[in-house]
Amino acid sequence: MKEFDYDKLVTAIDRFSPSKLIGKGSHGYVYKALLHHQDVDETRQRVVAIKTPSSLSPSSPSSSSSSKSEQTKKLENEIDVMSSLPYHPHVLSFLGHAEKKLMVVEYMPNESLYQLLHVSTDPLPTWLKRIEIALQIASAVHFLHEHGIIHRDIKSENILFDSNWEAKLADFGLAVDFGGDKKIRPAPAGTIGYLDPCYTLPENLSMKTDVYSYGVVLLEIVSCRKAIDVSRSPASIVDWAVPLIKEGRIGEICGGGGGGSGVFRGMSLRLLRMAARCVSSDVESRPCFGEITAEIVACLAEPLKSLPLWMSVLRRVVKLKRRKKRLRETLTWPGQTCRVW
């Protein structure tokens, strides 16, 4: 993993200047920075994000020594987990660290899924784009599970977008390496509304814990409703959506984009039934991410069956051209190669 000079990173964010601050979390601050490095005969530049424990920032409220230690441990854990993973197009790319106090990751200019669905005044993404986002995140979590990592904090705020509006899973502060013989079981943690209600004891942690959280995100994507909305009754998206799914009232769930009608109705019903399985109180009945990704791929193909042959072919050609426009660009840092999509 690449190690950066601590002082150079601090200088790049103007010594934790508020003008460079782009995000705050419960355990850390995120700053935007422009880094330079010498590559053969030229100096290359890259915009990155630098994450710090909030205790390092002069503008952060004073906190106890135990709180500072907890923040530092979470960042160190995030660095350890992310540095152990190979590249995946829908997992935020780790670029390096400085003394395990500052973490450098790729910069994501288009904010989060939460912002897109619940805050932005721009039109919602199309129905198919929203389901494509759901597939991208499912593939990311499937990748993590194949490498023995349980994320433990899957939520719309931790799904970020790059310049091409490709979704990437971020924030590995609570992630656990569950691979091999490690089987680390920390105390339950996560975000209310996304946290698996069956995860009440350390020994209850499993890959299905992430499945529940993903199911909440999938309901959020389909309905455009928040995971917890105290202005509504019931406040929980799960308590609201699951009874409607069981009754087949999908038109009352799908938010924007025509997901509940026309050629998308069959797709919507399949997705919502799968979401209901993800958030089931019967942990063993929840699907694994291999099954989830396969089902979403099948759902995305469903509307094409209803189209005339020439439209299906045209759609595939257009999609192929769009993919070619997003050919991978390789950026080489000293000691590391990182592809940006």
Curated annotation (Swiss-Prot):
Q: Name one Pfam family in it.
A: Pkinase
Q: Where is the Protein kinase domain?
A: 16-298
The ranges of region (Disordered) come to 52-75
User: Per the record, what is the consequence of mutating L269Q?
Assistant: In strain: cv. Bla-10, cv. Bl-0, cv. Cnt-1, cv. Ema-1, cv. Ka-0, cv. Kas-1, cv. No-0, cv. Pa-1, cv. Sei-0 and cv. Tac-0
For this protein, the parts annotated as crossing the membrane are none
What superkingdom does the record give? Answer: Eukaryota
Known outcome of mutating E111G: In strain: cv. Bla-10, cv. Bl-0, cv. Can-0, cv. Cnt-1, cv. Cvi-0, cv. Di-G, cv. Ema-1, cv. Ka-0, cv. Kas-1, cv. Landsberg erecta, cv. Lip-0, cv. No-0, cv. Pa-1, cv. Petergof, cv. Sei-0, cv. Sorbo, cv. Tac-0 and cv. Tsu-0
Q: Which UniProt keywords apply?
A: ATP-binding, Coiled coil, Kinase, Nucleotide-binding, Serine/threonine-protein kinase, Transferase
Coiled coil regions, renumbered to chain? 311-332
* UniProt xrefs under InterPro entries: Kinase-like_dom_sf, Prot_kinase_dom, Protein_kinase_ATP_BS, Ser/Thr_kinase_AS
Q: Found in which tissues?
A: Ubiquitous. Higher expression in mature stamina and pollen.
What does the UniProt entry list as the effect of changing D177E? In strain: cv. Bla-10, cv. Bl-0, cv. Can-0, cv. Cnt-1, cv. Cvi-0, cv. Di-G, cv. Ema-1, cv. Ka-0, cv. Kas-1, cv. Landsberg erecta, cv. No-0, cv. Pa-1, cv. Petergof, cv. Sei-0, cv. Sorbo, cv. Tac-0 and cv. Tsu-0
Q: What outcome is documented for mutating T126A in this protein?
A: In strain: cv. Di-1
Point to the regions of Low complexity compositional bias: 53-69
- What is the enzyme's main class? transferase
Task: Add the further remark from the entry.
Answer: This gene is linked with a growth rate QTL (quantitative trait locus).
* Entry similarity comment: Belongs to the protein kinase superfamily. Ser/Thr protein kinase family.
Q: Could you tell me what this protein is called?
A: Serine/threonine-protein kinase-like protein At5g23170
Q: Which organism is it from?
A: Arabidopsis thaliana (Mouse-ear cress)
